[in-house]
């Protein structure tokens, strides 16, 4: 009986301990669970802010990548268009067609540009030869001053016409006019900005028009000096333009392929195109100087001296053309 009671007591104690442990276990399990729930509730607003911020950052990064991709694609597309335009220009020049910078075939190099001017210049030269022959006959026949004036005025108007034709042709192809491709090789050796130097022409005429009065000599000397100064200013302007253009083109040199280099290349070429646009202005100023010099020379001289001056100018350029013909026809070993 004592053993049974002892076992009962022991069992009761164990049961009680087990219950206590179970309660303690449950309590241990419940307490931490309640604490975690409170922590989750307090951290939830912060977690939502972080998530929103992360989502915003991801969206901003995605948009940035899309913008960069679109920018690179645009640059590559522009580079391809530029290369295609250059190919079109080269192809057109081989076929004799001038294409404007916008890609529109607004001028035909052979139809409305250089070749047309070459034909017009040939007709102009033929007409000038007729006028000069008429003037020479009148001078040799000792025609009256009034008759000489009519012929001289006609020749001066004819010079005005060639300057007008050059201005029109320069709008189609300024390089053709500036380079003197419409002139003979010997004439091109003495070419300055698409024509003759007024100052050099005046030097040539002074020796051909003697005797001259002191007032005429002074007038021609002043005209020669002012022409020389204007020519020097235009020459310096052309040199500055050429240097600026060279610097612009050199600035675009470098390894190709990256979007930055493509953008830089296109920007530099656009700047160079803008600077080339000033060539027409230089040519126009040079022709204005030539035209004004001829008219001022006529006002300084008597009508008979002006007639002799026009004959001397024509004979000088005729000899240059004849020299070119002889040079081209020379025997070659």
From Swiss-Prot:
Source organism, top-level taxon: Eukaryota
Subcellular location: Nucleus
Biological processes annotated in GO: defense response; DNA-templated transcription
Residues covered by region (Basic motif): 49-69
SMART domains given in the database record: BRLZ (SM00338)
InterPro entries the record matches: bZIP, bZIP_sf, TGA_domain
Gene Ontology cellular-component annotations: nucleus
UniProt keyword annotations, A-Z: DNA-binding, Nucleus, Plant defense, Transcription, Transcription regulation
Biased amino acid composition, Polar residues: 1-14
Protein name as it appears in the record: Transcription factor TGA2.2
Organism whose genome encodes this protein: Oryza sativa subsp. japonica
Annotated region described as Disordered, given as residue ranges: 1-48
Self-association and partners: Interacts with NPR1/NH1. Interacts with NPR3/NH3.
Residue ranges of domain bZIP in the record: 47-91
Pfam families tied to this protein: bZIP_1, DOG1
Bias-annotated ranges (Basic and acidic residues): 37-48
UniProt xrefs under PROSITE patterns: BZIP, BZIP_BASIC, DOG1
GO molecular function, one term: sequence-specific DNA binding
Annotated ranges, domain DOG1: 114-330
Region (Leucine-zipper): 75-89
